[in-house]
């Protein structure tokens, strides 16, 4: 890690022992481990997303398992003839197996994708591991991310655009993000969509896109939290709200939704802010 980040071993020892690292240092450590700052600080609400192949650390408690790329999930909403494809970790695949019969399911995916599924409005789910080949072999129109971008890149995108303080984002990480932007042909508008874009798949086949402007009163966070933690035992209203672009207040009926595609880091950070005491206890 020291060789990759340029942070001295003694400084890394201090951080590991509990001394506070700068945000830039934590981000550089996270990029060296192909994960997020939330993960290395133990404040990830969703399972770690490791942007590498062949990593699986099996622990006694499934909640603490760490895994990397497993394969791909294809989701076919009702009244649609187009699968939506996403890259998932082995831990995500195990959770899908456990929760597949729930009314609602939350699926953390790689490349900063988080899915909310209303299973009553999902026609079919396809799971393909490495041995099955690529989704394009069964879906010629497949559009798929490879899952190779560490979550810390998405955490730092806004600062990449606007922040000059090297205690928040290092030149090294800015260069890495710049390379990802070139490879993926991201423009500034694309970056904003990566940070807070939402795609809504309705059960009549209509698809809408928007940008989240998170408000602490938005109960989309409660919807995701309850579905992920409590499953069918959670309490759900008929509708949920979110604040969209230009501060537009949106109210959606859950039974009219097939799927929500959300930005994982944005949702995780806001869930942490709202539920911090419940999740991590008092400092």
Descriptions of predicted regions:
Residues 23-39:
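DNA major-groove recognition helix of helix-turn-helix/homeodomain DNA-binding modules
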Residues 127-142, 261-278:
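Short acidic, Gly/Pro-enriched loop/turn segments at secondary-structure junctions
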Residues 34-51:
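Short C-terminal boundary/hinge segments that cap the last helix of small helical domains
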Residues 1-4, 29:
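Short alpha-helical "recognition helix" segments of helix-turn-helix
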Residues 46-113:
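Helix-turn-helix/homeodomain-like alpha-helical modules used for DNA recognition
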Residues 116-128, 251-265:
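Phosphoinositide-dependent membrane-docking surfaces
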Residues 126-192:
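Surface-exposed beta-loop interaction hotspot
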Residues 6-21, 43:
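Recognition helix of helix-turn-helix/homeodomain-like DNA-binding domains
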């Amino acid at each position: 890690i020291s060789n990759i980040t340029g942070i001295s071993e003694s400084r890394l020892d201090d951080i590991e022992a509990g001394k506070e690292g700068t945000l830039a240092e934590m981000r550089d450590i996270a990029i060296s481990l192909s994960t997020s700052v939330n993960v290395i600080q133990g404040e990830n609400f969703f399972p770690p997303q490791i942007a590498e192949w062949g990593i699986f650390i099996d622990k006694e408690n499934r909640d603490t398992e760490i895994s990397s790329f497993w394969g791909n999930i294809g989701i076919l909403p009702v009244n649609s003839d187009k699968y939506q494809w996403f890259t998932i970790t082995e831990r995500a695949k195990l959770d899908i197996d456990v929760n597949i019969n729930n009314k609602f399911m939350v699926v953390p995916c790689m490349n900063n994708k988080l899915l909310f599924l209303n299973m009553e409005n999902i026609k079919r789910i396809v799971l393909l591991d490495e041995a099955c080949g690529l989704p394009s072999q069964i879906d010629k129109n497949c559009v798929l991310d490879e899952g190779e971008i560490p979550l810390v890149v998405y955490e730092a995108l806004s600062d990449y655009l606007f922040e000059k303080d090297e205690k928040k984002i290092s030149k090294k990480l800015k260069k890495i993000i710049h390379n990802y932007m070139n490879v993926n042909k991201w423009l500034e508008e694309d970056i904003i969509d990566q940070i807070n874009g939402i795609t809504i798949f309705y059960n009549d086949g209509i698809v809408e896109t928007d940008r989240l402007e998170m408000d602490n009163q938005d109960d989309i966070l409660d919807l995701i939290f309850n579905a992920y933690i409590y499953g069918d035992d959670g309490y759900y209203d008929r509708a949920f709200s979110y604040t969209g672009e230009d501060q537009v207040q949106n109210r959606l009926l859950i039974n009219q939704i097939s799927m929500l595609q959300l930005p994982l880091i944005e949702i995780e950070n806001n869930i942490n802010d709202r539920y911090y005491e419940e999740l991590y206890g008092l400092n």
